[in-house]
Amino acid sequence: MFLAQEIIRKKRNGEVLSTQEIQFFVQGITNNTVSEGQIAALGMAVYFKDMNMDERIALTTAMRDSGTVLNWKNLGLDGPIIDKHSTGGVGDVISLMLGPMAAACGGYVPMISGRGLGHTGGTLDKFDAIPGYQTEPDSDLFRKVVKEAGVAIIGQTGDLVPADKRFYSIRDNTATVESISLITASILSKKLAAGLDALAMDVKVGSGAFMPTYEASEELARSITAVANGAGTKTTALLTDMNQVLASCAGNAVEVKEAVDFLTGAYRNPRLYEVTMGLCAEMLQLGGLAASEADAREKLNRVLDNGKAADIFGRMIAGLGGPADFIENYAKYLPQSQIIRPVYADRSGFAASMDTRELGLAVVTLGGGRRKPGDALDYSVGLTQVCALGDEITSDKPIAMVHAQSESAFEEAAAAVKKAIHIGDEAPEKTPEIYRYIRQSDL
């Protein structure tokens, strides 16, 4: 028998907690035998004294096991259970293409996603723009769609990782969100509860990233790779660029449109293509569906070009209650804003730098993101045709199109866009879309 206050004292003094102590404390978080004050105190102790890798693995697995852990064995699936997770960005619509692409190559992707908060968009919010799509189906429907379509993208259900829900809300209110140990456990407990064989982790770097510096992003990527592999799930982390909007747009309905255009081949943003292919190729290799990076890319390009990935996206949408002809007729179903108008820079030159976070916040002010959890969204608003770094900007080339519901909302967003995109005399040096891969062998 352990005492919560003794566990807190031990960590406060910088000692290492045993797996049993961590399991006891997490059990207390779940069944309310540990108080809010005690949870806050342990969070602060970990924030200052940190945890070693064994402690992080113990915390992650205890939180994973605090609720239902999905088991796919009895479905008789003929491929690996694979997924990806992103730390969040602006115009990060990767999941919508990656899930169907991986499924088209023989994987099964039970993707449990989140809603947007702050400047980052949420995958579920994008699907809420599709009429009829159920982001919170019962587990039978979720399993059915995963088996039949190969992919289902839904929200976190109440019986998955209850310990994280309680712990996270307390961390949020007590300034301990930024601990790498606690971020690692929070992200991975939710992902690993989906019963994954392999995971590709997308850790963003730059002005629109969750972590403030490249070094902090790399530290998080290393922690996630070590802990996930330690918990028995093959995992690689990719450090990817978020110094500019990833897709050509940011919002909800506008990003769904870009995803469909990507899958059908109507338009593929080159940056979005590179990061999507990098993550998806890693998933295929980790899941044993491809022998090499080149083999994986060949398979992925094939399912894009022959329409199989687009077909699977359509089947997933129909399976979860959306329109059966969504791929063919998405324009009929997606909401459109009252005003769609260009924004021009005050001078000519080159797009030299971008405050991606501010562009994400411009979408929030339009009504396309949340200021606080529970806010209702306008799925039609956002930005499209956002320029890329290095683009030549002239008086007749817009830096973005703003989709707004009123004149005042348009003016406010247009001013924010002009402020966020800096025009210089010279094009900046090109940065890679993927900075590096962190595999288990690199640790």
From Swiss-Prot:
Keywords: Glycosyltransferase, Transferase
Gene3D superfamilies from the UniProt entry: Nucleoside phosphorylase/phosphoribosyltransferase catalytic domain (3.40.1030.10), Pyrimidine nucleoside phosphorylase-like, C-terminal domain (3.90.1170.30), Transferase, Pyrimidine Nucleoside Phosphorylase, Chain C (1.20.970.10)
Stretches assigned to coiled coil: none
Gene name for this UniProt entry: deoA
Function: The enzymes which catalyze the reversible phosphorolysis of pyrimidine nucleosides are involved in the degradation of these compounds and in their utilization as carbon and energy sources, or in the rescue of pyrimidine bases for nucleotide synthesis.
Record's GO cellular component terms: cytosol
Superkingdom of origin: Bacteria
Signal peptide feature range: none
GO biological process: pyrimidine nucleobase metabolic process; thymidine metabolic process
Family indicated by similarity: Belongs to the thymidine/pyrimidine-nucleoside phosphorylase family.
Pathway linked to the protein: Pyrimidine metabolism; dTMP biosynthesis via salvage pathway; dTMP from thymine: step 1/2
Species this protein is from: Shewanella loihica (strain ATCC BAA-1088 / PV-4)
Key word Transferase present: yes
Classification via InterPro entries: Glycosyl_Trfase_fam3, Glycosyl_Trfase_fam3_N_dom, Glycosyl_Trfase_fam3_N_dom_sf, Nuc_phospho_transferase, PYNP-like_C_sf, PYNP_C, Pyrmidine_PPas_bac/euk, Pyrmidine_PPase_CS
Enzyme Commission number(s): 2.4.2.4
Record-given protein name: Thymidine phosphorylase
A GO term for molecular function: 1,4-alpha-oligoglucan phosphorylase activity
Subunit structure: Homodimer.
